[in-house]
């Protein structure tokens, strides 16, 4: 059984896009060439990797999903081999795929990418944004080389970037809160607006520790929406200080009780196994944050 690496690369793209046309466009080859490569790969493996469903279109078979995960690992190893060779020849190139949540993309990434490009102009960077849970999933299935996510980091290896904590933002109409040193979450539990962003476990643990009932009266997907909700006096916003710093606003910020903290860090299956390019990006990232 001889496997063509080019066919494997094409399969990875098709497996990610689940669309022959889109895969062909991104690979800059014809649709028939893509279809032929998939057919040849299936023939060499004697497996059916993809099926076409009447309602859902192109889908991976169960074994196709397993092969896709292994194929991504093989691509990573191939890239690492070239990068190790290039590093030895004083010429680091390739591509780094990074999973990041929006606040990191706003607060940290511009400076980190600028610093990285000044040292490694031949390395391409692909930034994929999502929630912390999505990023952990992308690291797990090797869609990205590294991810930047909020704690807890298990089961991945992690390198700490910074500490973070939850704060409250209060509506301008709530005069009784302006003089408060902090917002007591138990007292105002019916007024809280939450923003999804990787702090859910930390919040849940704090509420459990202090025997406070966690009432998710209103939960939004992003910081901008939370700010607008608070502006319109719909409640008290609970958001991470790091995320809040990435959004312009004129609301009053208050500490909360009980105090809720979390960490933000870089995660990977193994930092020893990531490519030289990804390893260098982690070093630059940590230098920028410090």
From Swiss-Prot:
CDD domains: PBP2_LTTR_substrate. One of its GO terms (biological process) is positive regulation of gene expression. InterPro entries: LysR_subst-bd (IPR005119), Tscrpt_reg_HTH_LysR (IPR000847), WH-like_DNA-bd_sf (IPR036388), WH_DNA-bd_sf (IPR036390). PROSITE patterns: HTH_LYSR (PS50931). Residues 1-61 form the HTH lysR-type domain. Residues 20-39 bind DNA. Signal peptide: none annotated. PANTHER family: TRANSCRIPTIONAL ACTIVATOR PROTEIN LYSR (PTHR30427:SF1). Belongs to the LysR transcriptional regulatory family. This is Uncharacterized HTH-type transcriptional regulator YoaU. It comes from Bacillus subtilis (strain 168). The gene is yoaU.
């Amino acid at each position: 059984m001889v496997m063509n690496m080019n066919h494997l690369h094409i399969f990875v793209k098709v497996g990610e896009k689940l669309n022959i046309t889109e895969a062909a466009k991104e690979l800059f080859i014809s649709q028939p060439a893509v279809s032929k490569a998939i057919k040849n790969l299936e023939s060499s493996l004697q497996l059916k990797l993809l099926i076409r469903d009447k309602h859902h279109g192109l889908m991976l078979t169960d074994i196709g999903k397993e092969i896709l995960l292994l194929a991504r690992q093989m691509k990573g190893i191939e890239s690492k081999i070239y990068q190790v060779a290039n590093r030895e020849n004083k010429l680091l190139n390739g591509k780094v795929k990074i999973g990041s949540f929006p606040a990191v993309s706003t607060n940290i990434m511009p400076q980190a990418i600028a610093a990285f490009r000044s040292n490694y102009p031949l390395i391409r960077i692909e930034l994929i944004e999502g929630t912390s849970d999505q990023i952990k999933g992308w690291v797990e299935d090797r869609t990205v080389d590294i991810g930047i996510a909020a704690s807890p980091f298990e089961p991945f290896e992690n390198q700490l970037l910074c500490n973070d904590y939850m704060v409250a933002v209060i509506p301008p109409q709530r005069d009784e809160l302006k003089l408060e040193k902090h917002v007591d979450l138990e007292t105002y539990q019916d007024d809280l607006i939450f923003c999804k962003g990787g702090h859910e476990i930390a919040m849940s643990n704090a509420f459990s520790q202090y025997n406070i009932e966690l009432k998710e009266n209103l939960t939004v997907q992003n910081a901008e929406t939370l700010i607008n909700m608070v502006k319109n006096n719909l409640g008290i916003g609970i958001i991470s200080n790091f995320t809040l710093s990435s959004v312009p606003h004129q609301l009053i910020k208050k500490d909360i009780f009980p105090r809720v903290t979390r960490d933000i860090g870089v995660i990977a299956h193994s930092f020893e196994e990531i490519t030289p390019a990804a390893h260098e990006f982690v070093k630059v990232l940590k230098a920028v944050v410090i």
